[in-house]
Amino acid sequence: MNVRERCRRLWEDPGPRKDRSPFALLLEVFSLFYRVGVVLRNDFYDRELFRSVRLPCRVISVGNVTAGGTGKTPMVILLARLLKDLGYRPAVLSRGYGGKGKAPVNIVSDGASILMSPLEGGDEPVLIARSVPGIPVLTGSDRCLTGRNAIERMGADVLILDDGFQHRRLFRDINIVLLDSDRPWGNGFLLPRGPLREPPTRALRRADIVIRTGGMHNRTSGEAAGTQVETGDSGAVLLRSSPIFRGIHQPCALISLDGGRKMDLQYLAGERICAFAGIGVPEQFRKTLESLGAEIVEFLAYPDHHRYDSSDLAFIERTAKEARAEMIVTTEKDEIKLAPMEKLALPACFLSIEMRVKPQKSFEHLVLEMMKDG
């Protein structure tokens, strides 16, 4: 078992101090140093010893307090569509994690066409560009620089930061923070012993809007001030004055890898499925398929941002055939990396999912009011 896999298992501990192995204790020491560094950095920004850069347009950040998937990319897509439909000229700025484009500014999409592959631009930026045609998508480590390029070269009047909550160098008008409903703080530890990027109590003071995603799909969170957010692990509760909404990952369609034919979601009911995913929380994908009535005979979980090759596809096909699967299903994020490869022998599809925020009208109204007041 490699270091990454051992860390992942520690992060999935049901309790913060279940594993007391030497490896876990060593990571706890590293987490203490990390905590000191991140707290000092945030204090410097809070006291304006470090200054944030203001750009001449509105800036909205979408992020979270843990490493891993909470639905940031679907949320960015939702916001980009909303703002575009209302007549704004949004551009998305991403770190471009996993992409090979290392220039100071990488233009994944100029709004007219997609200019980079997932290998060059990163999985999420290409997915965003494909999902919202007509908006620029740029990557680079310096969001101030990519933001200026989006404004000056592409006419953007609002910037959306994908995974930008901790990037405090660029001032933002709205901070949207996504929390996993089941385990908002993971195992309670900061990196690298746990998935927390910063102490949550301090982090949520900067949040303007909180969205609870994943799990408990039939529950509705209130949007009024003072809504409770439970850790799910220690039972601690944070009371926030920020509005809290419910984010639901809504399956929309089943789309074939061969030709892009759309199929009704009911097609999955009773089907023997071999599913695979290389995303932040693959288990959530499995639960979604099961909720649609699929019989999952094999489920293959790959690391987030995994780069598939021919041997991976051969293994997936062989596994599916041995399990007598009738169909292979993956995520849209994984599908964009399969396009250049040979076709799978079995029928293969990807599940298209969109973010829905409830109550929708209240959320849209609040974002627009904050845009005007910013």
Curated annotation (Swiss-Prot):
Q: Does the keyword Kinase apply?
A: yes
The UniProt record lists the EC number as 2.7.1.130
Task: Return the InterPro entries for the record.
Answer: LpxK (IPR003758), P-loop_NTPase (IPR027417)
* Cellular component per GO, a single term: plasma membrane
Gene Ontology annotations of biological process type: lipid A biosynthetic process; lipopolysaccharide core region biosynthetic process
Which reaction equations make up its catalytic activity? a lipid A disaccharide + ATP = a lipid IVA + ADP + H(+)
Pathway entry: Glycolipid biosynthesis; lipid IV(A) biosynthesis; lipid IV(A) from (3R)-3-hydroxytetradecanoyl-[acyl-carrier-protein] and UDP-N-acetyl-alpha-D-glucosamine: step 6/6
Q: What molecular function does GO assign, one term?
A: tetraacyldisaccharide 4'-kinase activity
Keywords (alphabetical) are:
ATP-binding, Kinase, Lipid A biosynthesis, Lipid biosynthesis, Lipid metabolism, Nucleotide-binding, Transferase
Q: Record's Pfam families?
A: LpxK (PF02606)
Q: Where does ATP bind?
A: T66, A67, G68, G69, T70, G71, K72, T73
What enzyme category does the UniProt record give?
Answer: transferase
Q: What does this protein do?
A: Transfers the gamma-phosphate of ATP to the 4'-position of a tetraacyldisaccharide 1-phosphate intermediate (termed DS-1-P) to form tetraacyldisaccharide 1,4'-bis-phosphate (lipid IVA).
Family indicated by similarity: Belongs to the LpxK family.
Under what name is this protein listed?
Answer: Tetraacyldisaccharide 4'-kinase
